Amino acid sequence: MNIKPIIPFEPVASDRIPDGSEWIFQIKWDGVRVLSYFDGQEVRLFNRKLNERTRIFPELTNIKSFTNAESIILDGEVIALDSEGNPSFHEVMKRDGIRRVDRVDKVKQEVPISYMIFDIIYLDGNWIHDYPLEKRLKILHEVVQPNIFIQIVPIEKDGEVLFEVVKQHGLEGIVCKNLQSKYEIDGKNSNWMKVKNYRDVIAVIGGVTYRNGIVNSMLLGLYDKNEQLHFIGHAGTGKLTREEWVTFTRAIEPLRIDGRPFVNKPDRIKDVQWLNPILTVKVQFIEWPKGHSLRQPSIQAFVQLDPKSCLIQE
């Protein structure tokens, strides 16, 4: 491929919704960020960490089914829906977490995906990331024709109304974007802001408890800058099925250790089995009071991430 993959522009977290005619608002989909690259010869897909996903999401590689562009880079979110028709990080991770390509055909029948495109960065041999967002969106609607796998993320002008809809449907949140903003490659600034309906964290599993021989809760932690693992709470509810709990119980057998991996002593440590802290999970929570554990944590999905990158935000 003749186009070098880029690190995408990121929104900053915010607890307020901006107002003014220069702002637009979009749903924040609970999926995985994927950029599509077409250099005129081949299509390749990469995530925000520059890991290739071309063979994981083959439905998105038929570029001529939705654009006549000679070359293009698109930015969007790959999502999968749960049984109630809502975007589910747990579901999409069943696809994004595939490590054996020979399983893709089977799993793609079980977990259909959609590509929610929200930006265009490169077109017909020219970088257009310096164009204002308003102009990029106009171009995006001109060159991309939605189909069964491809959608363009809708735009709303009233952020407060959209956030109320998000809360009613239990969605992740909204993204607020300034229409005059450039697309800052490998950048992050307040021209794009994300306002979440709930909070989440990627945490490290440092121990488990069992019920009837099957793991029923995880002890979670985050590292500090000195690479010490701090206990942040227990989680035993969420989106994992019983089958996934059983599979997890078998998988952690080689990770059992005698010593506590956390620098601080967890509460309720009776009958805990400590683990070598190398597995990570995405956890949603309502609140994290200072000096206390996560409030109402809920396990969403296992995530492939370097545990040492799971850091406490100072």
What are these regions, as identified by a protein language model?
Residues M1-E314:
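Catalytic cores of nucleic-acid ligases and guanylyltransferases
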